[in-house]
Curated annotation (Swiss-Prot):
It is found in: Cytoplasm; Mitochondrion outer membrane; Mitochondrion matrix. GO terms for biological process: mitochondrial protein catabolic process; mitophagy by internal vacuole formation. The lineage of its organism: Eukaryota, Metazoa, Chordata, Craniata, Vertebrata. Residues 112-210 form a coiled coil. Keywords: Coiled coil, Cytoplasm, Lipid-binding, Membrane, Mitochondrion, Mitochondrion outer membrane. One of its GO terms (molecular function) is cardiolipin binding. Residues 214-241, 471-485 have a biased composition (Low complexity). Its main location: cytoplasm. Residues 214-244, 451-485 are annotated as: Disordered. This is Mitochondria-eating protein. Belongs to the MIEAP family. InterPro entries: MIEAP, MIEAP_C.
Length: 485
């Protein structure tokens, strides 16, 4: 019996019977008499099938209870119902009066709906006639406007000989002005060509100078240390850098920034990998060194500009502003920048950075050459208008495709940055060069755990007083012959 009841429960007949009843209730007044009778017959058929299964369940249930089980229940429930059924009217119970009444009500409803539809059609017809009349009126007005236009065009074509001569004279004058403008533009183009040729020659000479410096730096001769002058005006201006346009200097700096990422960064990474096996920590060290180098170079540029402005302001004369004169002087004397002080500041800041952990035998002086190059480029970028700077970064920030590229070992579906490999170069709010970042799922939680672990780094900062003294006084080597901007 349980199987029969389960099949009845899973069957769609009861639900289909209810759906058909709902649909019949909605469409009863729209359907015809035959359609309503057909729907009623379908419902009776479905009901008979459901009743057949219910009677089968009733029979099985009674058999399970024994020979006389359930007799009283069946008598009390079915005998009154069977008596009521037998006392009902015969199959011809629908009298003619009910059919007549139903027919009259349907006719009244149909006549009402027909009149309503007829009124709607008449209103639409009247509105269409009004629109047609308005269109005809617009057509007449358009024809009148067309006639007026034709008349005016005919009058315009009847120009006199004097007007034609005047137009010809104006045409000759316009041609002469155009020729003068073309000559002026040609002169301007020639002047720009001469400037570009001069710039190319300057760049060529500077390239030869840089090549000679590079060849001397590769020679086995000892490194020469040049002493820095205390005054920013102790050296003469560099004419090659001063004559370059801002766009050319920006292009060179962007190229040098990309070259540092492609070459110097990898050299520093290879050098650190000899002592630190963790590639993630090595990349973090290089990224933090780059960020600190930009910060130190910007601070040094502000101080240098204040000193130059203070020195030039008493004797400044000429059409250009004092700020332009200061920038021109800095561009022409970039070698006066004390890059070694910035390198020392960067190394000091990295020694107390809580995100870095490394063995005690490793010193950041190993990558002082890389820091030196980044400081030079960052300092020179401040002389541009507008200056170039790196983007602000936070571990666990949302990854942005327009600002960073994912590394090859990143999880490309991860939305957060695990750590940054290289910063993005910005001009105001515009991305000039994309940076590089590692994305992993759970980056925010991993960054928090890495901070908590780095609170006790592998390298102990309190080994001995002598060790700290040696590290604080250890000089950073300078690279001679390094190209400067």
């Amino acid at each position: 019996m349980a199987d029969i009841l389960r099949r009845l429960t899973n069957s769609e007949r009861c639900r289909l019977l209810q759906d058909k009843l709902d649909d019949w209730y909605k469409d009863y007044h729209i359907n015809s008499c035959d359609s309503n009778l057909n729907v009623c017959c379908e419902l009776l058929e479905l009901n008979s099938k459901v009743q057949g299964q219910l009677f089968k369940i009733l029979s099985v249930t009674a058999q399970e209870g024994g020979q006389y089980a359930g007799v009283e229940t069946i008598k009390s429930r079915f005998l009154p119902w069977l008596g009521t059924c037998f006392s009902t009217a015969s199959p011809g119970s629908f009298s003619e009066n009910s059919f007549v009444t139903l027919n009259e009500s349907m006719e009244r409803k149909l006549s009402t709906s027909h009149e309503r539809e007829l009124n709607e059609v008449e209103s639409k017809l009247s509105s269409t006639r009004i629109e047609l009349n308005s269109v005809r009126q617009e057509l007449l007005e358009t024809q009148m406007d067309l006639e007026d236009t034709k008349t005016k065009s005919a009058n315009t074509l009847l120009a006199t000989e004097e007007e034609i001569l005047q137009l010809r004279a104006e045409l000759r004058a316009a041609r002469e002005k155009l020729e003068l403008r073309s000559l002026d533009s040609i002169d301007e183009y020639e002047r720009q060509i001469r400037l570009l040729k001069d710039e190319i020659s300057i760049l060529s000479s500077e390239s030869s100078i840089l090549k000679s410096r590079l060849s001397r730096s590769r020679s086995p001769s000892p490194i020469r240390h040049s002493s820095r002058s205390s005054s920013p005006f102790a050296r003469s201006e560099s004419p090659t850098s001063a004559k370059l346009t801002s766009a050319s200097r920006q292009a060179r700096l962007i190229s040098r920034f990309n070259d540092i990422f492609a070459n110097d960064r990898l050299d520093a990474q290879t050098l650190l990998r000899r002592y630190i096996q963790d590639l993630d920590m090595v990349q973090r060290i290089i990224f933090i060194a780059t960020v600190e180098s930009f910060h130190s170079a910007k601070m040094a540029f502000r101080q240098f500009r204040l000193r130059v402005c203070k020195s030039l302001s008493p004797s400044h004369m000429g059409p250009e502003s004092l700020e332009d004169a200061v920038i021109d002087y800095i561009v022409g004397n970039l070698d006066l920048y004390d890059v070694q002080s910035s390198v020392n500041e960067v190394i000091s800041a990295m020694n107390v950075n809580p995100k870095i952990s490394f063995p005690p035998e490793v010193d950041f002086i190993l990558i002082s050459g890389f820091i030196q190059e980044v400081c030079r480029v960052a300092f020179t970028m401040q002389t541009l208008d507008p200056p170039l700077d790196i983007a602000f970064t936070v571990d666990g920030e949302l990854f942005t495709d327009s600002k960073y590229r994912r590394t090859y070992d990143s999880e490309h579906t991860a939305p957060l940055v695990y750590y940054h490999v290289w910063p993005a170069l910005m001009e105001n709010d515009n991305v000039i060069v994309k940076g590089e970042a590692v994305t992993k799922r759970g980056a925010l939680w991993n960054s928090i755990r890495s901070r908590s672990r780095s609170a006790s780094p592998l390298r102990s900062h309190s080994d001995s007083p002598g060790h700290n003294l040696t590290r604080s006084r250890s000089p950073s080597p300078r690279r001679s012959g390094t190209p400067r901007f």
